[in-house]
């Protein structure tokens, strides 16, 4: 029996997901769905000129997955060094007494509001497009699928407010957002999901950020596996949530942790953004907008901090 590359079984019994429909060497995944025509469609959504900042402020006390840290150190010794320089003025370098301070960071990009690279999650020893870890992992990152290989994002954004649709302040840990939830919320606003869209989910869980960080980091609601597949079937480019990961935790099946982002990233190349700040946009009933996400091009990294902008 001859099997298609998309359905042939792998060693662990799952069906083969490579080569990607975007090409055997592709590293951009579903961001390929954002065409020039899509960008023009998104730009035409701007009517008011109002900008919503969807990122949280980064600092050392933000909630994070265990083992992940953010430390910022300030370097002020330039002041003393400058005063010893031959061209120093009375209080700094030169007759204008210029001084400066800088900071240094010890941190992972996998905390705070960030975009995951398609090298972040694997299924066994394979990534999106079937690349083997043994072939791509190097000392300072991966030679394929690093965050620097992903294009910057300018597209149509949709905010699906499931908390409002269900009539509460927030969903609870383990709550599963279903296809029916998404369709109901979309119907209430008169919008639909199109290829190349970025679909963001407001669960209300993000309201705990900074107010109860311990509770925020213990669990989360999120899109379920069926909804993730629905998003992939609709050819979305990107999806995100106001939670520390993506998908319900505890998971729908206790033996399949983080299976939702795994499905999106590994099988479909759909990019995920986590820890979004969506309270203000949801409160103001912002459901369709121009979304701009520019990420630092960190060579071979598994993610990057982002400050997404929703513009209406």
Set out the residue ranges of the language-model regions.
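Active-/binding-site microenvironments in catalytic and ligand-binding cores
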Residues: 1-312
């Amino acid at each position: 029996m001859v099997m298609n590359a998309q359905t042939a079984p792998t060693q662990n019994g799952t069906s083969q997901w490579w080569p990607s429909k975007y090409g055997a060497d592709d590293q951009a995944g579903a961001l390929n769905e954002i065409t020039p025509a899509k960008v023009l469609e998104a730009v035409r959504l701007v009517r008011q000129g109002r900008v919503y900042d969807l990122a949280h402020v980064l600092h050392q006390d933000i909630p994070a997955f265990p083992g992940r840290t953010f430390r910022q150190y300030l370097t002020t010794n330039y002041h003393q060094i400058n005063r010893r320089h031959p061209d120093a003025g009375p209080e700094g370098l030169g007759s204008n007494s210029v001084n400066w301070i800088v900071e240094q960071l010890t941190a992972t990009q996998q905390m705070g509001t960030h975009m995951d690279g398609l090298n972040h999650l694997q299924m066994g020893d394979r990534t999106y497009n079937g690349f083997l870890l043994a072939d791509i992992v190097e000392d300072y990152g991966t030679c394929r699928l690093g965050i620097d290989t992903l294009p910057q994002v300018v597209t149509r954004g949709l905010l699906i407010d499931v908390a409002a649709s269900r009539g509460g302040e927030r969903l609870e840990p383990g709550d599963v957002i279903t296809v029916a939830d998404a369709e109901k919320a979309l119907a209430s606003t008169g919008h639909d999901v199109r290829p190349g869209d970025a679909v963001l989910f407001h669960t209300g869980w993000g309201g705990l950020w900074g107010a109860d960080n311990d509770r925020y980091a213990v669990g989360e609601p999120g899109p379920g596996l069926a909804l993730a597949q629905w998003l992939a079937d609709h050819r979305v480019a990107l999806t995100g949530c106001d939670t520390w990961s993506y998908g319900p935790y505890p998971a729908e099946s206790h033996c399949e942790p983080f299976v939702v982002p795994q499905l999106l990233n590994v099988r479909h190349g759909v990019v995920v953004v986590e820890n979004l700040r969506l309270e203000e946009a949801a409160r103001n009933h912002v459901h369709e907008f121009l979304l701009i996400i520019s990420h630092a091009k960190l060579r071979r990294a598994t993610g990057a901090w982002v400050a997404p902008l929703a513009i209406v």
